[in-house]
Amino acid sequence: MSRLIVLSNRVKMPDNNPMAGGLAVALSELLKESSGIWMGWNGQIAESDNTADSAVLDNGYKDNSNEFTTYTKSTSVLSSVGCPASTLEITYITTALTPKQYEHYYCGFANNVLWPLLHEQTDLIRQAPEDYDSYQSVNRLFAQQLKQFIQPDDVIWVHDYHFLSVAYYCRQLGITNRIGFFLHIPFAPLKFWQQLDRSPELIKHLSHYDVIGTQTQHDKANCLTVMQHYLKPSSVTQHGSAHCLTVDIGSSRPHRLTVDAYPIGVNVAKIQQLVSQLSLECEPNTHKNTHIKAAAQNIIAVDRIDYSKGLLERFSAYSVFLQQYPNYQNQLKLFQIACPSRLDLSVYQRLYDNVRQSVHDINQQFLGTDEISESVKLGSVDLEAINETAPSIEGLSTAAFKRRWQAISYCENVLSHETLMKAFWHSDIGWVNSLKDGMNLVAKEYIAAQNPANPGVLLLSRYAGAAEQMQAAVIIDPQQPDSIVQGLNTALSMPLQERKERHQALLNGLKQDNLQSWQQDFLEDLYQVV
């Protein structure tokens, strides 16, 4: 029987913390159906670059640097011979990275070169001479591991920018299986690829996949332009929505490569189930039956601390809004959940410091003189003090406003998926301010978690991939403060009937292009490859 093999940079092991939902849960369910294999980095860094040195992994296995550990998780009953039923188990194959691989492959080429390039921030590219070689070495490493256990009918699904070259090395090793690639982040226009001297080789490597998927039609168009520029395909044909390129990859026959957009979705039914009891549990709220939301309103924003997410632009525009509409002071609250990320990279550490300073400065700006705390007077960023006055994320109802008002409540804690969905339910506005984003599932989860009788409003950046599908949101340009201010005012004053109509239109789209259809559409095209 054909098995599905998923390769992603990080693997969520079943014996660690529960999977928070989204892609991890979806891939788990998909892999169970075919006794599939999930392969990738376990998140650990080996103690040294010497492959003779070993490290003990979380699951209790002893692993050498770049020696792969196999772990099988079964949820089935035992068969008559005492073996788990094969259709209900997943095999996890993971490895640690060596310190040099972490520095040059992960921090270096993947996140200091490809990430800024694909997000059209080439001014932020930082590259050491060893970075590209390490990137290729790690891609080759995973291809070699695939070679060890691949079976003739297996299908390989590779995820994201960390592995542009894996298919190339698989073909070099004689692997002829179907291999698909899905890019979760944007595909940059040609002019950005032309600024990287390694682009011709990377695109040549990318052409060894059978199916390449992007998040949006815009990204697909960029991908096709880049492919045609570097590969000079002998033909380009269209079959339905997909484009097929015939390219020379040095094999015995021309290679056919399919490129299409497969917008990732969310599990709407599961999210709605998580919040279904809230309408019965929540305390009475006087504005629930009015046509206009009450003055005391909650805005929620959830982001990794990344320069692509537009956090500083959000805070700046929010400050302008409160100045232009002072009646919202002491009423409107922005709850920012911001997860620190990649702090080993200097650009991220600077951004992290700037985000916290900006939160502090805005809260100081809108405090009365008699309310200024010692930490404010000292001009320091006291994160603990900021969080002390933040409302409980599960209490984003009117009760939260009984506490002293501050403009921004800031949280760096990792929240469970259930807690986050409940927070969305309680919020009046969900704010996505991305400067560039492949999709942004927060936007989709926010809509899925809303109370249809009194839905909140989605404030959505035009530069998020989700905007291509979610035009019923209030679309803003995060690079234009006036656009954000106007969008906030529109969202805060929107009548109930309009909120309902917009929410229903957005929800219908989510149900049509959901997480399951994303998987099915991509894999259907991949399985059709001959």
Regions found by a protein language model. Name each.
Residues M1-V530:
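Catalytic cores of carbohydrate-active enzymes across secretory and cytosolic contexts
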